[in-house]
Amino acid sequence: MPPSSSNTAAASRSASKRLIKELETWSREQKEEKGIERLGPVNEGDLMEWEAVINGRGIGQGYDEGRWLVNISIPSTYPLAPPKMTFVTPIVHPNIALQNGEICLDLLKDAWTPAYSVLECVRAVRMLLGCPETDSPLNVDVAALLRSGDVLGTRKLVELWCQDSDSRYEGP
């Protein structure tokens, strides 16, 4: 086996061990977690593809009635590299691309360290909903509303979007 293949296999084993520990942590903390309804692998046999279902209860900014499915792709080099997270359910937010669900959050890019877990990333993404960063928008229209000071208009837009059946995850 070439060295690069053995390094990849070792990294993947290391990632799997870490993810199993993170799943154990989630199973202990799940009952107290109000904003994350579900977190874990999509299929039992693949630890590298996860999903989370998050809700907007208590976030404010119009997101309280929202419920979203988030895809989490974990690289074989995890925890040295961050997971890639995208919203599957459409969402209106300055830091989330409406077209593809891409999330702009430093924690998932340059600010990543192996000290973070997938659960902490999901919590951070959920927190981002209530604390938008208009300096690095992926949805420039919503960011422009906020920058212009139209907080009420933005909240009403988000509320309308969260109540639309096509923009609310209705699965398990």
Curated annotation (Swiss-Prot):
It holds the Pfam family UQ_con. Disruption phenotype: Impairs hyphal growth, conidiation, conidial germination, and sexual reproduction. Leads to a defect in pathogenicity and production of the mycotoxin deoxynivalenol (DON). Displays lipid droplet accumulation. Shows reduced tolerance towards oxidative stress. Leads to down-regulation of protein expression levels related to protein biosynthesis, fatty acid metabolism, cell wall synthesis, and oxidation-reduction reactions. GO terms for molecular function: ATP binding; ubiquitin conjugating enzyme activity. Residues 14-167 form the UBC core domain. The active site is at C104. Its EC number is 2.3.2.23. It is an enzyme of class 2 (transferase). One of its GO terms (biological process) is protein ubiquitination. SMART domains: UBCc. InterPro entries: Ub_conjugating_enzyme (IPR050113), UBQ-conjugat_E2_core (IPR000608), UBQ-conjugating_enzyme/RWD (IPR016135). CDD domains: UBCc_ScPEX4-like. It catalyses: S-ubiquitinyl-[E1 ubiquitin-activating enzyme]-L-cysteine + [E2 ubiquitin-conjugating enzyme]-L-cysteine = [E1 ubiquitin-activating enzyme]-L-cysteine + S-ubiquitinyl-[E2 ubiquitin-conjugating enzyme]-L-cysteine. One of its GO terms (cellular component) is peroxisome. Pathway: Protein modification; protein ubiquitination. The keyword Coiled coil does not apply. It comes from the Eukaryota. Disulfide bonds: none annotated. Keywords: ATP-binding, Nucleotide-binding, Peroxisome biogenesis, Transferase, Ubl conjugation pathway, Virulence. The keyword Transferase applies. PANTHER family: UBIQUITIN-CONJUGATING ENZYME E2 (PTHR24067). Belongs to the ubiquitin-conjugating enzyme family. This is Ubiquitin-conjugating enzyme E2 PEX4. It comes from Gibberella zeae (strain ATCC MYA-4620 / CBS 123657 / FGSC 9075 / NRRL 31084 / PH-1) (Wheat head blight fungus).
